[in-house]
Amino acid sequence: MKRILFSFFLSLITILSFATDGFTVADVFTDHMVLQRNAIIKIWGEAPNGSLVEVRFAGQLRKVKAIQGKWQVTLKTGEAGGPYKLDIINGNNKVSFQDVLIGDVWLAGGQSNMEFALRRVKDAQKEISSADYPQIRYYKVPRKFYPEHEVSKASWRVCSPQTAPEFSAIAYYFSRNIHKELNIPIGIIQTPVGGTTVEAWTSRTLLMSDKDFRPIVQHYDSIVNSYGSDGYEKLYNRYVSSLAEYNQLNAEQKKYIDKPVEPMGRKNFHRPIGLSETMLNTVIPYTLKGFLFYQGESNTARGAQYRKLFPAMINEWRTAWGQGNIPFLFIQLPRFETKTRYWYELREAQYLTSHHVKNTAMVVAFDQGNPKDIHPIVKDTVGWRLSQLALGKVYGKKVVCQGPEFKKMTKTADGSLLLDFANAGTGLVSKDNAATLSGFAVAGKDGKFYPAEAIIVGKNQVKVKNNLVTNPVDVRYLWVNSGDMNLFNKEGFPAVPFRTDKYRLVTEGVYVNPEPKICRSSL
């Protein structure tokens, strides 16, 4: 008993010294972490200025002195494996991390459909009960919305039926499939926050650098300045009080009373820049294999701007990590019925990004959306498509990993348009075995589009026509928020939405989102 108490006392001294001496290791480093294989990885933290920090890992020893209170070392990792121990020493302080694996690390970012937890999917319990994968781990970056926001520290969690419920469903299915295929440890760093715009994950410097982005910051600054010196805090406190009152209402009462809307300001996670500073920066520059991203719903009022803003965010992330053009795989928005936003324009922006930004690739998910629910509960298919994309584009496997993509258009003698598709795999198919294909429209020189009769011709061609359009010049496919689709390749991947025309976008010249309703002071 005395020995146990003495050991506890020594541990307590170390912990207190760790806290009081100013020596820390970045929060992302914990037991059960996964470090990127075959890479130069970075370990970092804080320590008293000029003090020596020693890092020991897998037979390597690195020593560095803290400069201006910060330290960072680099280590080499080899092939996938483990477990290892990582020791970090500063004076009398020593921190040891156990059960460290070497494998591939992916950062999963975006908004609610990436955040969507496994416990919420269809048949969740069946999946969770079998989610016993000791070599798959995930780390959820704490949801810190402003600098003084107090949040609990996170830790790497080993995937099991006990921990899987909070795993991002799409990231879970992705990592499970990659792990089974490659038999290596997979680590997922989760950063998504529901409802966030893409500019929430960028810097002020980036947004102020472009005339098409600058209005975002200027609009936000004008709102903040309109409150006066202490106006925002008063309004925010009023919102907190109103929200507390609202949460006391029963379900029937909530039918008639709107939920209070949080005022825009420095504590609102919808603000531009914020989460880049308080969440993303906490895991930079943790060495990665690549990025997984599912976002865009909150930018669907500004699809034209997204054509530049999304690539700019990708480039800024890559610059911040300092790993060159590492893979950036993302999911195109699915179908969703709405009359106030323009999902089809944002999908086009995503498609263009996949072609214009190096080492990016896109999963088509139109068919996986629920027209009536922005958060579809079936995520395994999207996760599988994302994993196939990684296997084909990142890991060099010879697999079909994308769906049919429009290549060229020719006119035929009977007034039809013949469309050629790339990525047809072993052939185009109508998934529901229908005689005609859904989602096509054609137009003449007047720009009026009419639903087209479309049929598959041969292995990789589709013939479209409408008798009302005698001289068709343009075709669109799934240029809608929501609708039916059935064009796939035989490998099960859906065709990419497209249009051949260059008509002006509805969202051109729109630089900020519509204003939300102002929250009231009381119920």
Where are these regions (language model features)?
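Short amphipathic alpha-helical "recognition" segments used for binding
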Residues: 6-7, 521
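Cell-envelope and extracellular/periplasmic
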Residues: 20-523
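Positively charged n-region of N-terminal signal peptides that target proteins for export
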Residues: 1-4
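Bacterial N-terminal signal peptides
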Residues: 7-17
